Amino acid sequence: PEVSGVSLNEAGEPIAEGLTVAETKEKLMQLMPLIKERLHFLCDAAEMVRFLFTEPAVPPVEQIIPKKLDAVKTKEVLEASKEFIAAIATKTEEEADALARQIAEGLGVKLGDFMMPIRMAVTGSRVSPPLVGSIKILGVEKALERTNRTLASF
């Protein structure tokens, strides 16, 4: 049965729409180190990986806006996040974190208020594996597409 955009073929191997068995396995194996510390129960994994295999709906704007920001500032954050997302492919985790802090500081927002709208745009959820690793596995182009789609809702 399909739970997270991934189902099993007759041989019991994971398959996802548009991906080969090998590609599906590769994405799952890349994601496992990111989610293992966050899992309370194995069944929680399905929800955490859904964004990799299915296109999440754009969340309602109210859910994207951090508590301490308004819609205008959140849209500004999402616009600025495109630079961050585009740079992730060539950055280490530490370099990406430093860049996120630098951009957030330049916008005058806290790091969490910078990252939350990006997380919502890219994964469709407030809870996900670490964002930088998630974007690398998903792919920068796909993350930018989702960010632009979310921006269009503002």
Where would I find each of the regions flagged by the language model?
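Charged substrate- and nucleic-acid-binding regions of tRNA-handling and nucleotidyl-transfer enzymes
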Residues: E94-F154
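Small-residue-rich helix-loop
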Residues: P1-L107
